[in-house]
């Protein structure tokens, strides 16, 4: 995580490598903004020759070149404004795209524990809202600082050029203005951090409402969800109003200081020693320049709020980039594992938990064996699977595949050896065929996909659909029943043809008839494969070569079905209970 005193300069230094590839566009836009501000300054400077000499009949040259100068300056102002807007939009668009890509890529390689600790809504807010804040804030800040800053410098220079005595008063007010901006900016940053954190909460509440809309309706939770959303949205409104109040207060301070300065200059210019040195054109240029300074000064005070939004968003994004990705230092690569698995003295505690989920686990599974993991919910069955897939890393002990430590395998190669059908299936908003062949669409033929679907008994319902395998199934397969979704997931695992098969309550959502069919298909593919089956139903467990009974993170019984029945222990009691049912 970033430190609280992470300076603006350090944030910019981290952001610059993302911006630097597009510095040519940035330079063009900066030059265009300076030209734009210079054009405004030169327009004001035309007042002096116009007032001093433009209305004298003897000076006809001014009436000739003055209109031409105005047209030229307006064309310069318009074209430079277009160029700056185009290139700033181009640069900011590229920057936000690259930040999103980098963030998405970084999140894709984060450990599972990262997602366990954060809501989907908060992470969505980082990718969408925060990245957009960086780009929009940066572009608006750049436009304001360069254009208005150049205008202020130009006006200062012009005022000092015409009368340094009157303009020297501005030297006094400049430090006061910047001190005021600095004080208010600290408050802006605190408020913006609260707003951005609560934007994630808004996304989280909306996400829960969309996903749990049926539960909300059936349990009558509409009012509770509305109240939660109203509270968070009102909090964001209150914080936004605090920014408006702070910004408006600063605006009042700047205007008050400017009015005092104008009054002082007006008084000084009326002194006999000064008024003799000034012409009507000079006084008009200085006063007009002073009034013209109000707009850029006001813009610079307002830009601070946008700047702080961008800085807070950058801090939030960089805090994610600073979290370490999955450890993947292994170099071992195999085409196809034999499937021999060994857990040696494994102890594991989930992040944020006090008690270990697994305690001193020792398991040896021969290649091609089917091992059933049974036990009550929370006993540690799924944790064993999570450690084998390296979704989590053991606190103590080692896990081996074919007598090689899992950490020595490249992660992608290790996971290519494992097909997983979890109780929490996720299907993508795509066709059935693309879901079955997920991430391997170019490798498998239509015939292979159909074969896997037939083996999983999924073709029974697929052929009844109008578009068959090309049917779009909706987000997470919402257009399918629970059993149909489960069979698609099983077909996906069958197609992978991996040496290790993990079935985590794979048939839990199926009716008896479908379960029998799928179980037959699973029995076929388990041959010559190492299979880990997590199940509660004895009918699924009985055929396993070995049964491991897990309770409170420990293996309390192991053996095949007949051996455990003869022991008359906990497994035998579970068996009798299910028979009675």
UniProtKB/Swiss-Prot annotation:
Domain of life of the organism encoding this protein: Bacteria
Record domain ABC transporter: where: 341-577
Matching CDD domains: ABC_6TM_MsbA_like (cd18552)
UniProt keyword annotations, A-Z: ATP-binding, Cell membrane, Lipid transport, Membrane, Nucleotide-binding, Translocase, Transmembrane, Transmembrane helix, Transport
Classification via Pfam families: ABC_membrane (PF00664), ABC_tran (PF00005)
Transmembrane segments: 15-35, 62-82, 152-172, 252-272, 274-294
Catalytic reaction list: ATP + H2O + lipid A-core oligosaccharideSide 1 = ADP + phosphate + lipid A-core oligosaccharideSide 2
Residues given in the record as ATP binding sites: 375-382
Keyword presence, rRNA-binding: no
Membrane topology value: Multi-pass membrane protein
Domain (ABC transmembrane type-1) ranges: 27-309
Location relative to the cell: Cell membrane
Entry's Gene Ontology molecular function annotations: ABC-type oligopeptide transporter activity; ATP binding; ATP hydrolysis activity; ATPase-coupled lipid transmembrane transporter activity
InterPro entries per UniProt: AAA+_ATPase, ABC1_TM_dom, ABC1_TM_sf, ABC_transporter-like_ATP-bd, ABC_transporter-like_CS, ABC_transpr_lipidA, P-loop_NTPase, Type_1_exporter
PROSITE patterns per record: ABC_TM1F, ABC_TRANSPORTER_1, ABC_TRANSPORTER_2, MSBA
E.C. number(s) listed in UniProt: 7.5.2.6
Primary location: membrane
GO cellular component terms, A-Z: plasma membrane
PANTHER family, alphabetized: ATP-BINDING CASSETTE SUB-FAMILY B MEMBER 10, MITOCHONDRIAL, ATP-DEPENDENT PERMEASE MDL1, MITOCHONDRIAL
Family recorded in the similarity comment: Belongs to the ABC transporter superfamily. Lipid exporter (TC 3.A.1.106) family.
Domain notes: In MsbA the ATP-binding domain (NBD) and the transmembrane domain (TMD) are fused.
Subunit architecture: Homodimer.
Function per UniProt: Involved in lipopolysaccharide (LPS) biosynthesis. Translocates lipid A-core from the inner to the outer leaflet of the inner membrane. Transmembrane domains (TMD) form a pore in the inner membrane and the ATP-binding domain (NBD) is responsible for energy generation.
Identification of the protein by name: ATP-dependent lipid A-core flippase
Species the sequence originates in: Wigglesworthia glossinidia brevipalpis
Taxonomy of the source species: Bacteria, Pseudomonadati, Pseudomonadota, Gammaproteobacteria, Enterobacterales
Gene that specifies this protein: msbA
């Amino acid at each position: 995580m970033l430190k609280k005193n992470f300076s603006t300069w350090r944030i910019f230094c981290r952001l610059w490598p993302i911006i630097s590839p597009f510095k040519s566009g940035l330079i063009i836009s900066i030059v265009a903004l300076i030209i734009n501000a210079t054009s405004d300054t030169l327009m004001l400077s035309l007042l002096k020759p116009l007032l001093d000499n433009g209305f004298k009949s003897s000076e006809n040259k001014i009436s000739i070149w003055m209109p031409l100068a105005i047209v030229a300056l307006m064309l310069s102002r318009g074209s430079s404004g277009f160029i700056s807007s185009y290139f700033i939009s181009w640069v900011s668009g590229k920057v936000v795209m690259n930040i999103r890509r980098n963030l998405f890529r970084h999140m894709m390689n984060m450990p599972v524990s990262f997602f366990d600790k954060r809501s989907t809504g908060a992470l969505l807010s980082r990718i969408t809202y925060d990245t957009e804040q960086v780009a929009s804030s940066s572009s608006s800040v750049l436009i304001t600082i360069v254009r208005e800053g150049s205008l202020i410098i130009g006006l200062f220079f012009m005022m000092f050029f015409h009368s340094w005595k009157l303009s020297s008063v501005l030297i006094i007010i400049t430090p006061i203005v910047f001190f005021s901006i600095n004080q208010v900016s600290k408050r802006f940053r605190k408020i913006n951090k609260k707003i951005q954190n609560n934007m994630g909460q808004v996304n989280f509440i909306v996400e829960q409402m969309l996903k749990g809309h049926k539960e909300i309706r059936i349990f009558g939770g509409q009012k509770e969800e509305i109240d939660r959303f109203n509270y968070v949205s009102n909090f964001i409104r209150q914080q936004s109003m605090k920014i408006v109040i702070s910004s408006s207060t600063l605006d009042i301070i700047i205007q008050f200081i400017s009015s005092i300065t104008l009054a002082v200059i007006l008084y000084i210019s009326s002194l006999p020693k000064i008024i003799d040195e000034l012409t009507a054109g000079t006084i008009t240029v200085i006063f007009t320049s002073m009034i013209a300074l109000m707009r850029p000064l006001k813009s610079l005070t307002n830009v601070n709020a946008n700047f702080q939004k961008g800085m807070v968003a950058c801090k939030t994004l960089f805090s994610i980039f600073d979290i370490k990705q999955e450890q993947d230092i292994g170099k071992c690569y195999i085409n196809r594992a034999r499937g021999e698995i060994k857990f040696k003295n494994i102890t594991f505690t989930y992040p944020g938990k006090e008690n270990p989920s697994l305690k001193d686990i020792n398991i040896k599974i021969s290649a091609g064996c089917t091992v059933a993991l049974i036990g009550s919910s929370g006993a540690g069955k799924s944790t064993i699977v999570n450690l084998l897939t390296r979704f989590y890393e053991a606190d103590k002990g080692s896990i081996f595949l074919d007598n090689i430590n899992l950490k020595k395998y490249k992660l992608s190669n290790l996971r290519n050896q494992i097909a997983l059908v979890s109780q929490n299936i996720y299907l993508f908003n795509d066709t059935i065929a693309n879901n079955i062949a997920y991430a391997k669409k170019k490798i498998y033929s239509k015939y292979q996909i159909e074969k896997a679907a037939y083996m999983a008994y999924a073709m029974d319902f697929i052929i009844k659909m109008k578009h068959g395998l090309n049917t779009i199934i909706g987000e997470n397969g919402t257009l399918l029943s629970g059993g149909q979704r489960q069979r698609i997931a099983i077909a996906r695992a069958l197609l992978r043809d991996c040496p290790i098969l993990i079935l985590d309550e794979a048939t839990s959502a199926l009716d008896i008839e479908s379960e029998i069919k799928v179980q037959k298909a699973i029995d076929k593919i388990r041959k010559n494969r190492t299979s880990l089956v997590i199940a509660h139903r004895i009918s699924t467990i009985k055929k396993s070569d070995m049964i491991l009974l897990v309770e409170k993170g420990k293996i309390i019984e192991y053996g095949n079905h007949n051996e455990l029945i003869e022991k008359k222990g906990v497994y035998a009691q579970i068996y009798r209970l299910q028979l009675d049912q």
